Amino acid sequence: YLSLEDVLSIAKAGDANGCYEALFTLGDKPEIKWNAAKDELNKFGFNSTHQYLIHCMKEVNESMTIFPHVNPGLMSKDEINDLKIHSPSGGIMIESFSKDIYSKGKPHYKTTTKFVDLRLETLNNALEIKYPMTTGLLLGLTETKEELINDIEQMVNVSKNNSSIQEIILQNFRAKVNTLMRNNAEITNDLFLRIIATIRIFVPGHISVQVPPNLSPDINLFLKSGINDLGGISPLTIDWVNPDHLWPNLEKLSIEVLKSNQVLKKRLPIYPGFIQKEWLNEIMFEKINNIIDTNGYPKE
C-alpha cells in the first residue's frame, strides 16, 4: 500500500498541475489472502483495505479540488455507499463474458473475483445506489470469434439495462514479457476498429466509448471509428496498470484529435450527463458545480 503521506503527495501534485482525477486502483481485498497486506493495514491502524481506502479518499477529497475515482474490485452496496461520500464515480471491468477463460491454462484460471456474475452484481449494486460507473472489455483474452461476438452482444445488453454505466472502455490486450501470456497474439487494428464501431452503434448514445491512447499507437485511426474519450493521461506518473506503455504527448494528441473533427478537453471523473443530485451526495454535487461550466466541464 501507499502510505497516506504518499497518497496526499501524489494527489497534491496532480491538483497543482490541473488534474481533476486521482485514480485509486488496487487489488481486490488482498488482506484476505496475504498476511503481508493484513499486517500493513494493521500498522496503519485499519482492519481492511476498504477502510483504508475510504480514509485516503476522504483526506484527498476534503483538502483538494481533485476528485477520487476508484477501481477497488468487487463492491457491495454498503461499500458503494461509503465510496459515494468521497468520490463521484467508480469502475469495474467485465473484461470478458467467456466461461472458457476460467479453464486451466487460460487467463482467469483460479481467479475468484473476476467471475462475470460477481462483476455484474457490482454494477447492479451501483445502479441501486446511483453511483456512476465505468466498465469495459479486455480484447484479446478470448480465442474464438464466437466468444468475441458474445462479448460485444452481452456488453451492449448490459449497457442498455444498467443506467449507472457512463463509460465503456475497450482495452486491447498487450503481451508482457515474463508472463504466461507473453506469446499470445494481440488484436489487429482492423478487428479492433470494427469492434469499436459496432459498440458505438449499439450502446446507448449517452455512454462514452474509450480506448486507452498509450496502448494503441495508431490512435488517429481509432479517433475516426467511434470513440469520444481517451481516459486519464497523467502529467506526473506512469500508467501503473500498464507501466511498459508511455503516455502520448498531449500536444501531438490534440492535433490528431482536431484532425478527426473533435476537440481534446479536460473532464471530470463523472460525465456531464450524470452531474445530477440523484447521482451525487449533496456535498459532492456542490463541489462539482463550483468548478464546472454550463456544459459540465471544468472551467478554463
Predicted regions and their residues:
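Auxiliary Fe-S-binding modules of radical SAM enzymes
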Residues: 8, 62-64, 149-300
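Conserved Radical SAM active-site core
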Residues: 1-161
